[in-house]
Swiss-Prot record:
The lineage of its organism: Viruses, Duplodnaviria, Heunggongvirae, Peploviricota, Herviviricetes. Residues 1-29 are annotated as: Disordered. Structural component of the T=16 icosahedral capsid. The capsid is composed of pentamers and hexamers of major capsid protein/MCP, which are linked together by heterotrimers called triplexes. These triplexes are formed by a single molecule of triplex protein 1/TRX1 and two copies of triplex protein 2/TRX2. Additionally, TRX1 is required for efficient transport of TRX2 to the nucleus, which is the site of capsid assembly. It comes from the Viruses. It is found in: Virion; Host nucleus. The keyword Magnesium does not apply. GO terms for biological process: viral capsid assembly. Keywords: Capsid protein, Host nucleus, Virion. Signal peptide: none annotated. This is Triplex capsid protein 1.
Length: 465
């Protein structure tokens, strides 16, 4: 039996004539997709209708798919109601969505209006790391909850009070308590901890930059008092990583007097956002060299490949020698494998906190059940006992020996905490670019590290003890 092939264009399927648009007809791969969704031998109207009966009234295909430009209700089938037109619109939308996804990587921006006491974007540059600070009025209450017995909990409130006297809202401290929650520039935080870094010259350059380029006549006093706040937080076990979190990488800003509206990339590629500056339309992450650690190079680990970025706080809890440092660490180690590497890198701090972390704490009362008397209980046949299956039964469990030790002055996980880290993001390139150079901030030269291709992906804090 001889069969005639179906015409290409215009095509006649089931009595309807459709001509495909040239752009859609010529697109590679669409012919195969059309054959899968609509075989050429399929009938449009299904089984034949009885003679004398009209076509069924059904919802338009485009209307059901939400692709019909008109808002008309479902009606009779029309020449425009066919699978080919619906398929054309679906394919065009898919192609546009894929092109948009490839052309512009997804990133998320966040904006906040802040006081410029601890963050002045005019002095820093696009790509500077910003941290969000919890409301300072909450910190004295946290100190009363978390400080061990014997610690001076009022020290934290006094330190923040002195800091507020050197800020823009110092005159209203008695009425408002403390200023509202705001942002802390990573450069300002490093400048406040400058005395604690090993690279002292580079840290002093960051402090000189903040002192010279931040507006105000009491910037130096503000740095000293903020440093005292950090030490008081370590003293009262209100650790800085518990009240600070990643906010984003600075992109653009608008300032007026003591206020600033800052925009930052909080997730996604840092370089995907436009800065609005003609000279530097894109921003790479810029960090002080004294606060950057290439962990793989320090420990001789890894090779070429993508790397993670971590924000790390370190603490020393020895009495009257408390300190706090902040770093950005690059490593190929995932979060679950970073803690052993930090223990090796900051092992001296871990030992110091384990030995001296309980100093200046109220000691336990003498002979107050210091140890669990397991040997004596096991040797005494009259000691109440029960089987493992009877432990959940109050009739047997209530007769067991109750050990009530005095844990005051004893080492705990908080007294031994020497570091805390949180994932910031990653550098997905096989060979991440870390450029070490000296940048001019006004009249001050600061050694910096520029990280290219950073993708922000912030995570939760993890304490190391």
């Amino acid at each position: 039996m001889k069969t005639n092939p179906l015409p290409a264009t215009p095509s006649v399927w089931g009595g309807s004539t459709v001509e495909l648009p040239p752009t859609t007809r010529d697109t590679a791969g669409q012919g195969l997709l059309r054959r899968v969704l609509r075989p050429p031998i399929s009938r449009r109207d299904g089984p034949g209708l009885p003679r004398g009966s009209g076509p069924r009234r059904a919802a338009s295909t485009l209307w059901l798919l939400g692709l019909d430009g008109t808002d008309a209700p479902p009606g009779a089938l029309t020449p425009n109601d066919d699978t080919e037109q619906a398929l054309d619109k679906i394919l065009r939308g898919t192609m546009r969505g894929g092109a948009a996804l490839i052309g512009s990587p997804r990133h998320h921006l966040t904006r906040q209006v802040i006081l410029t006491d601890l963050c002045q974007p005019n002095a820093d540059r696009a790509g500077t790391l910003l941290l969000a600070l919890r409301h300072p009025a909450d910190l004295p209450h946290l100190a009363h909850q978390r400080a061990p017995p014997g610690r001076q909990t009022e020290r934290l409130g006094e330190a923040w009070g002195q800091l507020m006297e050197a800020t823009a809202l110092g005159s209203g401290r008695a009425e408002s308590g403390c200023t509202r929650a705001g942002l802390v520039s990573f450069n300002f935080l490093v400048a406040a901890c400058a005395a604690s870094y090993d690279a002292r010259d580079a840290a002093d350059a960051v402090r000189a930059h903040v002192t010279a380029n931040y507006r105000g006549t009491r910037v130096g006093a503000r740095l000293d008092r903020f440093s005292e706040c950090l030490r008081a937080m370590v003293h009262t076990h209100v650790f800085p990583h518990e009240v600070m979190r990643f906010f984003g990488g600075l992109v653009s800003w608008v300032t007026q007097d003591e206020l600033a509206s800052v925009t930052a990339v909080c997730a996604g590629p840092q370089e995907a956002a436009h800065t609005g500056h003609p000279g530097r339309p894109r921003s790479a992450v810029i960090l002080p060299a004294c606060a950057f650690v290439d962990l793989d190079a320090e420990l001789g680990l890894g090779g070429p490949g993508a790397a993670f970025l971590y924000l790390v706080f370190t603490y020393r809890q020895r009495r009257d020698q408390e300190l706090c440092c902040v770093y950005v660490i690059k490593s190929q180690l995932p979060p679950r494998g970073l803690e052993p590497a930090l223990e090796r890198l900051f092992g001296r701090l871990r030992i110091t906190n384990t030995i001296h972390g309980t100093e200046d704490m109220t000691p336990p009362a003498p002979n107050r059940n210091p140890d669990f008397p397991l040997a004596g209980l096991a040797a005494n046949p009259q000691t109440p006992r029960c089987s493992a299956g009877q432990v959940t039964n109050p009739q047997f469990a209530d007769r067991l020996y109750r050990w009530q030790p005095d844990l005051r002055g004893r080492p705990t996980a908080r007294t031994c905490t020497y570091a805390a880290f949180a994932e910031l993001g990653m550098m997905p390139e096989d060979s991440p670019r870390c450029l070490h150079r000296t940048e001019r901030f006004g009249a001050v030269s600061v050694p910096v590290v520029i990280l290219e291709g950073v993708v922000w992906r912030p995570g939760e804090w993890r304490a190391c003890a």
